[in-house]
């Protein structure tokens, strides 16, 4: 019996080592880096999406105001798009039509405004700071002009940080729609100095 006990205790450290080896996380290495071929392929697929539509829920949250709406985004070419915000009753709160060199905004009273800077116009008229030029890329899961981004284990955008004119936006991708090809974001959140923009895409139509 004593010899059996010694034999038993001698096996315990070996078993512990085997269990520890099984629980050591495997490093993914450079596979999910921005230079990986899988990301490059996914990025190229996204860049080819010249026409698409998506609709869902929009929330803008800051210390000064909270806005909840339904949204419809229609992209007809890389430089032409339409953004529609509606209230829970389905009435239009804001319609933005962007074309090269000119932007037209129609408010909930039917009054129209024209500008060459959609982001500045929305901020002046609604108080909401929305980085529209970058959002056109971010909504698809593209990093746009920033090199500061990370990928998830499926080689899709996970998080990005964008800085311009002293303003820093951090975008987190929380969920993807894998029912479309290529997979497209279904939930993302933008943060900038106390401001949050939440987008939940209920559907995508690729043309």
UniProtKB/Swiss-Prot annotation:
NCBIfam families: lolB
Signal peptide start and end residues: 1-21
Protein name: Outer-membrane lipoprotein LolB
HAMAP family noted in UniProt: LolB
Organism: Yersinia pseudotuberculosis serotype O:1b (strain IP 31758)
Functional description taken from the UniProt entry: Plays a critical role in the incorporation of lipoproteins in the outer membrane after they are released by the LolA protein.
InterPro entries named among the record's database cross-references: LolA/LolB/LppX (IPR029046), OM_lipoprot_LolB (IPR004565)
Topology in the lipid bilayer: Lipid-anchor
UniProt cross-references to SUPFAM superfamilies, sorted A to Z: Prokaryotic lipoproteins and lipoprotein localization factors
Claim: Signal is one of the keywords in the record: yes
Keyword annotations: Cell outer membrane, Chaperone, Lipoprotein, Membrane, Palmitate, Protein transport, Signal, Transport
Family the entry assigns: Belongs to the LolB family.
Subunit structure: Monomer.
N-palmitoyl cysteine: lipidated positions: 22
BP-aspect Gene Ontology terms: lipoprotein localization to outer membrane; protein transport
Lipidation (S-diacylglycerol cysteine): 22
This protein's GO CC annotations: cell outer membrane
Subcellular location: Cell outer membrane
Entries under CDD domains matching the protein: LolB
């Amino acid at each position: 019996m004593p010899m059996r006990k010694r034999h038993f205790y001698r096996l315990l450290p070996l078993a512990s080592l085997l269990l520890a080896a099984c629980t050591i996380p495997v490093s993914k290495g450079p596979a999910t880096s921005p230079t990986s071929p899988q990301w490059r392929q996914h990025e190229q697929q996204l860049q080819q999406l010249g026409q698409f539509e998506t609709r869902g829920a929009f929330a803008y949250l800051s210390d000064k105001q909270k806005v909840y709406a339904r949204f419809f985004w229609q992209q007809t070419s890389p430089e032409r798009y339409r953004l529609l915000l509606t209230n829970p009753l389905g009435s239009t709160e804001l319609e933005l039509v962007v074309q090269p060199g000119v932007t037209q905004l129609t408010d909930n009273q039917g009054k129209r405004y024209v500008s060459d800077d959609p982001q500045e116009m929305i901020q002046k008229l609604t108080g909401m700071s929305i980085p529209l030029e970058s959002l056109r890329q971010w909504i698809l899961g593209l990093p746009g002009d920033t090199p500061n981004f990370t990928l998830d284990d499926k080689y899709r955008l996970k998080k990005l940080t964008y800085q311009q004119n002293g303003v820093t936006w951090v975008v987190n991708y929380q969920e993807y729609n894998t029912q479309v090809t290529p997979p497209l974001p279904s939930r993302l959140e933008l943060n900038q100095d106390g401001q949050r923009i939440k987008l939940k895409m209920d559907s995508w139509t690729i043309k």
